[in-house]
């Protein structure tokens, strides 16, 4: 892995997609101005609706992923244009895409290169379900789970990717080995985030001896839902290099090849695996 600068964007997305697109572009531009080579957006950046079903009306067909695409898809076009205009690799959080099942969308992470062409995607596999403490979430009611474990590489760097609830399943990331950087857009609830977010992120970094970039939703949304925030960049030893507790903003950190190799050489746990 070559050394590079990564950024995590944190948002408090609203019910208005156009406002969210403007905010996304402004924050990615800010990250680029801070020297970021890669920028990761949070889950659900285009829309945090008042109801889980709101995203169905905004689901897009998957376009051909090219800058000169013939069909206009609002969210995908915004991501492509922003990557090209800012000269960054843009990991596009998640956007709602049309699925084969009526009443459900795919919750999809799209990756764009510096020319604005799509170079990867991943449909979220593990769907969040939680009830208790006056809260209930059931993503499976409105989202169709993906079937394919991601295999991504950008700038000749092998990557792992997951979305939010995927973080709780270590075998999901083991299935993506080998990789040097793990990217995770999320919208953790305040309840689960306060209890487990940092613990899980640092654990994934340590057990995979990799950098972790995690972008979150972070604040109170119009639905009354409160997301935990605390976007983080973590090194392969589990040290937190940067974090943003709440509110919109950008954090940056350098992903250093020497640091990665040092950790893996001094404690070659990945080579010692028996299972």
Task: Go through the PLM ranges and name each one.
Residues 17, 26-115, 190-203, 208-210:
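Cys-nucleophile CN-hydrolase/nitrilase-fold catalytic domain and related Cys-dependent amidase chemistry
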Residues 92-93, 108-111, 150-152, 231-233, ...:
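Short beta-strand scaffold segments in enzyme catalytic cores
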Residues 258-275:
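A short C-terminal boundary segment appended to hydrolase-like catalytic domains
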Residues 47, 53-54, 110, 121-128, ...:
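Short beta->alpha transition motifs characteristic of CBS
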Residues 100-177, 190-199, 266-269:
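Active-site catalytic loop in hydrolytic enzyme cores
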Residues 1-7:
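Extreme N-terminal starter segment of soluble prokaryotic enzymes
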Residues 10-17:
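Short polar catalytic/cofactor-binding loops
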Residues 67-91, 158, 167-251:
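CN hydrolase (nitrilase-like) catalytic-core segments centered on the catalytic cysteine
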């Amino acid at each position: 892995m070559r050394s590079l600068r990564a950024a995590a964007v944190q948002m408090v997305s609203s019910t208005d997609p156009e406002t969210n697109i403007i905010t996304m572009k402004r924050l990615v531009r800010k990250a680029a101005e801070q020297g970021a080579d890669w920028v990761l957006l949070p889950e659900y950046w285009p829309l945090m609706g008042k109801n889980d079903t709101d995203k169905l009306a905004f689901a897009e067909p998957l376009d051909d992923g090219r800058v000169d695409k013939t069909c206009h898809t609002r969210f995908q076009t915004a991501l492509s244009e922003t990557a090209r205009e800012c000269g960054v690799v843009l990991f596009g959080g998640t956007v709602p895409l049309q699925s084969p099942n009526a009443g459900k969308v795919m919750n999809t992470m799209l990756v764009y290169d510096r020319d604005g062409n799509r170079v990867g995607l991943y449909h979220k596999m593990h769907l969040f379900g939680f009830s208790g403490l006056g809260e209930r979430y059931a993503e499976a009611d409105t989202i169709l789970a993906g079937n394919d474990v991601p295999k991504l590489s950008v700038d000749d760097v092998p990557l792992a990717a997951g979305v939010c609830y995927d973080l709780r399943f270590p075998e999901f990331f083991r299935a993506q080995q080998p990789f040097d950087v793990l990217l995770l857009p999320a919208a953790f609830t305040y309840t689960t985030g306060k209890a487990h977010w940092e613990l899980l992120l640092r654990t994934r970094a340590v057990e995979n001896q990799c950098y972790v970039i995690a972008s979150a939703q972070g604040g109170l949304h119009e639905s009354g839902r409160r997301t935990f925030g605390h976007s983080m960049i973590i090194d392969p030893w589990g040290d937190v290099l940067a974090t943003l507790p709440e509110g919109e903003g950008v954090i940056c950190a350098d992903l250093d090849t020497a640091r990665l190799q040092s950790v893996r050489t001094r404690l070659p746990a990945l080579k010692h695996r028996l299972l």
